[in-house]
């Protein structure tokens, strides 16, 4: 097990956490803020000293990404059938969409500018979970990633998905998932690793218990 694989599991856990939260939110209209906050915070961590710092630091990242680590272990291990199919689809779609984004430098530049603007807004609100912060992150997704040819189709209860607050949360979570997918790629992660490097990734995930 390499240190690179250990770092990759952090990004992978964040991807699966985002995917699972979207799946839950789309069906119930509710989301666990303890799992949501570190994902949204990660969008503003543009100069983090380490991968761990992006999700809360050495002592907190493991707890912050506990849901994602659980889903990652299930998805890569023998419990794959227990993972919500929508969660798996969202996770793979996030990786695919980020790959398309990486080939669009102008859009990347726009996202960077918008993140800087959102970071300034945070000073006016108590938390990144404030509805205005979530709406700003959602708007960033709409103005950029929603314009690519590949779009993530979210399935759930229309009663919830038609609510502006829920729709904003969904897009904000997807944006955080793109952040995680970008980190995954920067750390050398590839989609085929989820098939052919499953044992190594599982070992790294288990080592973080």
UniProtKB/Swiss-Prot annotation:
UniProt keyword terms in alphabetical order: Cell inner membrane, Cell membrane, Cytoplasm, Membrane
GO cellular component, as recorded: cytoplasm; plasma membrane
InterPro entries assigned to the protein according to its UniProt record, in alphabetical order: HflD, HflD-like_sf
Annotated Gene3D superfamilies: HflD-like
Location of this chain's protein in the cell: Cytoplasm; Cell inner membrane
Record membrane topology: Peripheral membrane protein
Keyword Cell membrane applies: yes
A Pfam match: DUF489
Superkingdom assignment: Bacteria
HAMAP family, per database record: HflD_protein (MF_00695)
UniProt family annotation: Belongs to the HflD family.
UniProt name for this protein: High frequency lysogenization protein HflD homolog
Lineage: Bacteria, Pseudomonadati, Pseudomonadota, Gammaproteobacteria, Oceanospirillales
């Amino acid at each position: 097990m390499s240190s690179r694989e250990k770092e990759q599991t952090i990004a992978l856990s964040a991807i699966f956490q985002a995917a699972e939260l979207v799946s839950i939110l789309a069906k119930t209209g509710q989301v666990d803020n303890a799992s949501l906050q570190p994902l949204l915070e990660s969008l503003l961590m543009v100069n983090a000293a380490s991968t761990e710092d992006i999700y809360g630091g050495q002592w907190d990242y493991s707890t912050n990404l506990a849901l994602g680590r659980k889903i990652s272990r299930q998805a890569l291990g023998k419990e794959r059938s227990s993972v919500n199919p929508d969660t798996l689809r969202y996770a793979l779609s996030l990786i695919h969409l980020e790959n398309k984004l990486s080939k669009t430098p102008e859009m990347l530049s726009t996202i960077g500018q918008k993140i800087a603007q959102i970071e300034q807004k945070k000073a006016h609100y108590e938390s990144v979970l404030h509805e205005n912060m979530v709406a700003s992150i959602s708007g960033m997704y709409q103005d950029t990633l929603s314009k690519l040819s590949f779009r993530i189709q979210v399935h759930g209860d229309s009663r919830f998905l038609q609510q502006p607050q829920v729709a904003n949360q969904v897009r904000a979570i997807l944006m955080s998932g793109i952040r995680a997918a970008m980190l995954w790629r920067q750390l050398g992660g590839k989609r085929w690793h989820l098939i052919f490097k499953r044992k190594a990734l599982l070992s790294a995930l288990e080592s973080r218990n």
